[in-house]
Each structure stands twice: as structure tokens, then as C-alpha cells.
Amino acid sequence: MTARNKRVRCKICGILELEHALAVSDAGGDAIGFVFYPPSPRYIDPAAASRIIAKLPPFITTVGLFVNHSAEQVREILNVVPLDVLQFHGNEDNDFCRSFSRPFYKAIGVGDETDVVAEAAKYPDAAALLFDTHDPQLRGGTGRVFDWSRIRHELGKPVILAGGLNPTNVAEAIRTVRPYAVDVSGGVEASKGVKSIELIQEFIGEVYREYEV
């Protein structure tokens, strides 16, 4: 299998409803994300996330998104929600991220001044690095694309591409970056925080179409 047709994995983040989680699974998605950051319009109560996970089919990875939570807060959520992976979007360091006995992804906001290599080097234990558009006011879910040419594959970690992706641009993003996975939230929403089953299906369909080329 060539690099051209290795299947890119797909994560849909900001899930609030069971029907949308099942739509991800039915369409062939690989992972769903739950946002535990209260200021986000996609915030979900941990008990609600746990109820959704209990009804998921096998082989769907569940990811929890955290932003500068304390270790106690993270553990309280983990006591309620059976997450597979933790995803950190704040100023957490490597030691903090790895302290919960679960794989973790570290989000890196990419702006004009971001030294991508230096930022990546701070997280040697990350299972993957997630690159998103830098915005000092937002932690993910910016809805804006950054310069994909900034991503460097010599980072030595799987690359998850996020930031402004949607069904119309994800194919180009995959061809340009060749990431391990793509991550979308706002790009598959009918309105802020409200997922669209049709857009979820279109987005995942575009990801698979690139694999089939």
C-alpha cells in the first residue's frame, strides 16, 4: 500500500447527542470527541458522555478534550467517563499529560510565529500531535484554516490535522498534509454546537474517497 492510499483516520469532536455519535460509527468514522471545557458551546456533562459511550458499538475510540483542568478535575471525569484517549488543548506539560495512565494527544495551535518543531518536542510521550489554528481566545473549534505547509512530518509523531475542516476542503487537506487523521467539529454542524448527520456523512465520505483514489 502506498502513502497515497493509506486510509486517513477520522475523528468527529464535540458530540452531544447519541444519534450523532451513532452517525459517526455508521458512516465509518474512527473516533468521537467529548468536550469537557465548560466555556465551549460543545461542552457535555460527564454523565451524559458516559451514557453515550455505553451505547456505542465496538472499535470506536472515545476521546476527552480538556483545557487547563487540574489533575483532580481530570480524574473526577475519568471516574465517570470511560475514555480511551485524553486530548489536551491548554498549557499542560508532558508530565501532566502522561500522568493519567492513558494515551494522550496534545493540541498545538499553529500561528505565524509558531515554531512547530520546538512545540512538538515538548511532548515526547504524546500518542499523536493535533495541529489546529492558533487563537488566544479559543481552544479548538476556531472554524479557521491555518497554513498547512507549516506541518512537518519529521516530528516523529502521528499528525492529526484540525482547524476549519469541512466536507468541501478535507480532501485537499489530506492531499496536502498526508496526516494520520483529521479532526472536525464546527465543519459538520448545522449551527453552533449542533451536529448535522448529513454533514457528518459527507465529511467521512470525502475522507474515504481520498483513500479510494
Curated annotation (Swiss-Prot):
GO biological process terms held by the UniProt record: L-tryptophan biosynthetic process
Pfam families: PRAI (PF00697)
Reactions that this protein is recorded to catalyse: N-(5-phospho-beta-D-ribosyl)anthranilate = 1-(2-carboxyphenylamino)-1-deoxy-D-ribulose 5-phosphate
Molecular function terms, GO-annotated: phosphoribosylanthranilate isomerase activity
Superkingdom: Bacteria
Keyword check for Amino-acid biosynthesis: yes
InterPro entries: Aldolase_TIM, PRAI_dom, RibuloseP-bd_barrel, TrpF_fam
EC number: 5.3.1.24
Keywords: Amino-acid biosynthesis, Aromatic amino acid biosynthesis, Isomerase, Tryptophan biosynthesis
Pathway: Amino-acid biosynthesis; L-tryptophan biosynthesis; L-tryptophan from chorismate: step 3/5
Family membership noted in the UniProt record: Belongs to the TrpF family.
HAMAP family for the chain: PRAI
Protein name: N-(5'-phosphoribosyl)anthranilate isomerase
